[in-house]
């Protein structure tokens, strides 16, 4: 049986917090900022947390990540 490998694409996009949750960055932050309000841009800066529905699937991809 081969070793289970960490999904490298997911490893670059998610980080584990101290409590075991997964941090993620928001979408819509690479360009077209002139159309967005200051408030919208400010809210996009803060990292989000992976929702409960997606957590199980992403955790399987990051199984070996410390």
Swiss-Prot record:
Gene Ontology cellular component terms for the protein in this record: cytosolic large ribosomal subunit
Signal sequence segment: none
Pfam families from the UniProt entry: Ribosomal_L35p (PF01632)
Entry GO MF terms: structural constituent of ribosome
Coiled coil start-end: none
Database matches in InterPro entries: Ribosomal_bL35, Ribosomal_bL35-like, Ribosomal_bL35_CS, Ribosomal_bL35_sf
Key word Zinc-finger present: no
Disordered as annotated region, ranges: 1-26
Alphabetical GO biological process terms: translation
Matches recorded under HAMAP family: Ribosomal_bL35
Assigned protein family: Belongs to the bacterial ribosomal protein bL35 family.
Protein name listed in UniProt: Large ribosomal subunit protein bL35
């Amino acid at each position: 049986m081969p070793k289970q490998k960490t999904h490298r694409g997911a490893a670059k996009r998610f980080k584990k917090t101290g409590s075991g949750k997964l941090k993620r960055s928001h979408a819509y932050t690479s360009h077209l900022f002139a159309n967005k309000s200051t408030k919208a841009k400010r809210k996009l800066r803060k990292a989000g947390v992976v929702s409960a529905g997606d957590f199980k699937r992403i955790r399987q991809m990051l199984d070996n990540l410390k």
